[in-house]
Amino acid sequence: MASYDAIAELPLEIESCSFEGLELVLGEFERLTTVIRFSGGGHEGVGEDVTYDAVDHVAQQSAGPPDGLTGKFSFDEFSRRLGGIDLFAAGGPEREMSVDYRRWAFESAALDLALRQAGTNLAEILGREPRPLNFVSSMRLAKFEEGAKSSIEPLLERLAVYPTLRFKLDPFNDWDDELIDALVATGAVDSLDLKGFYKGTPVDVITDPELYAKLIERFPDAWLEDPDVTEETKPLLDPVHERVTWDAPIHSIADIEAMPWSPPRTVNVKPSRFGPISKLFAAYDYCEERGIGAYGGGQTELGPGRGQIQYLASIFHPDTPNDVAPSGYNDPAQATRPGLPSSPLEPSIDPLGFRWRA
C-alpha cells in the first residue's frame, strides 16, 4: 500500500485556525517563521511555515487565516481543498518556492490534528518504527557580512564541545589549500553543498572548476550536493557521479528522474520543498522501491516544523547524513557550549499526532 493511502481517509474536523509568529536573530541573519494552529474536536494540530521572506510572514499574520479552511473532511479532501485556496491572499509570495513551503505548513498542521482526533500517531498508522536519527550540522565558514573570509574556527569551536559531530559544509570561493587541508584533517565532513542552483541569493557561489577539482580529490568520501553541471565541471563530476546528490531542484519524483546521472545513489528529500504531503510520501515510496537513498533537510525551523522533519527522518531514513540537527546547532551561541543532544538522536515522538517532543 502506498504510504499516503494510510492517511488519506483520516477524518478531519477544523473549527478554527490561528497563527503565531516566531523570530530569532542568528548572528547577522534574522529568521521569521509562522506556526499554523488548527483546532477541532478538543485537539490542536500544528505546522510551521518556513517561507524565507519576512514580508510574507508579516502579511499573513496581519491578515489572519484565509476563508475556506474550516469544516469536516477526509485528510485528502482537505489537501485538495487547499489546492484551491490562495494561501498568499494577503500578498506575495516574494518567491515562487514559498507556495510549497506554506502548503507544507498547512498540511502538516492538518495531519497532526487528524491523527490526534483519530487517537493515533504517524509512525503507528504507517506501520514504521521510529529509530535513532543520525544527523549532521550544516554551516558555512564565513559570515554573511561583505568581505567576510572563511575560517575553520567556527567548526573547531563546535568540535571542541561535540567531538563526534559531523558536518555538511557550504564551500565558498575563498577556500584555499590551507583551509581545505585543515578541514580534511578533522575527518568530520560528510557533505559539501556546492549551491549550484542558487542565483541572486546571499548564499550564491561562483562556479569554480578548479575548486571543484580540489574538493573532489581532497574529500573522497563526501557527498557532493547540488553541483553546477557545466561544460567545465561535468568532466570532473562524471567519474564521481555516484557521490553527486541533489537538494534545491527536488520538488517531485519527476525532478529526481530529470537530474543528470539519474537515478541518483541518494537524494535530499526535504519535506517543505514538496508542498502537498501526497507528493512527499510518493517520493519516499519511489526512492524506497528503487533503492535510492534519502536524507532529510531543514529550513532553519524555529518551532514544531523542526521536530516534524526529524520525525519523518526517523521513520523513513534514520541512518543517513540527515541535515536536521536540533535547532540549537543553528545558533552559534548554543552550538559552542554543552547541552545539545548528540547524534544519533533518540526517537521522541508524541503518542498522538505528528509531533516530535523537544
Identify the residue ranges that each predicted region occupies.
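Broad gene-expression machinery/nucleic-acid interaction feature
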Residues: 33-35, 132-134, 266
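C-terminal extensions of enzymes
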Residues: 330-358
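Catalytic core of soluble alpha/beta enzymes
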Residues: 175-311, 322, 326, 330-339
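Short glycine/serine/threonine/alanine-rich loop segments
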Residues: 120, 292, 318
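Residues at alpha-helix termini
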Residues: 116-117, 289, 315
